[in-house]
Curated annotation (Swiss-Prot):
This is Probable allantoicase. Belongs to the allantoicase family. Transmembrane segments: none annotated. The lineage of its organism: Bacteria, Pseudomonadati, Pseudomonadota, Gammaproteobacteria, Vibrionales. Coiled coil: none annotated. GO terms for molecular function: allantoicase activity.
Amino acid sequence: MEKALNFEQYVNLADPKLGAEAIFATDDFFADKSRLIRTEAAEWKEDLYDDNGKWMDGWESRRKRSEGYDFCVVRLGLAGTIAGLDIDTSFFTGNFPPSASVDACYSPDGEPSDSTEWQEILSSQSLQGDSHHLHALDNEQVFTHVRLNIYPDGGVARLRVYGRPSVNWDQIGIDQEVDLAAVVNGGRALACSDEHFGKKSNILGPGRGENMGDGWETARRRTPGNDWVIVALGRPGKIGKVVVDTAHFKGNFPDSCSIQAAYVQGGTDDQVETQSLFWRELMPSQKLSAHNIQEFVEQVNDLGAVTHVRLNIFPDGGISRLRLFGFKSE
């Protein structure tokens, strides 16, 4: 029996926003390989056709009339360990592959070649049409590329590769300031009160948000209380500066925010939600403004090394990015 896995607590290493790219496919006659890893969920366009037939939101090969099978190679945006996979056949009904498997390799200095050694990380699995196929993995190796094999042909809407980025913290000096929460540094959004309009993981992404959808936004709160999100830092460290970016949030930014933090030892990711109610105050409540980058330094309390933070927003609304600058601890 496969272990249970909360996929939302991991990073999609195959996200184009992190630099991932579908670099090769044996055939993508009906639907371009680049669509296999699009950030957005797959969609159906009823009356859209192109020169090769029905437009499909995913990767689709032509009907195979010879021996063999099709595959697509994806360069991950961030090298890392892979905890789970989602092979998504949304809207592929009469044209999905009967089965698929996934291989991975470590090729940090360039693209894989004919001599590259691939390792099977998911054996051949039966697929259903218009379905998500979630598979938890137990593998601690670091990979840079994955290869989706489909037997013998057909279409897959999306491939999600959930894992943890591999960060060489030895290359970061003890006196070098770094964003401890950034996804590229291993930061992960673990839990939140609500993410009706935008996913919690967006606040740790690179750069500024592209639009309002590229942030974390909650539904309008109609009951007492406030919304919150919990973040695991990529490395324990001392936080000295907080940056809250409300880019594109103009009529729906939070009135204010505060941050709690703790050095969590032991337990699981799922247990921190209850613990977070009692964490110490890293930053007392601060007013926020629309479509603005706000930096807080003097307002940040010295808590020493911490591993997790809880961002509280009052009462609800949207945040584009959260940056937690500090120094790694030994």
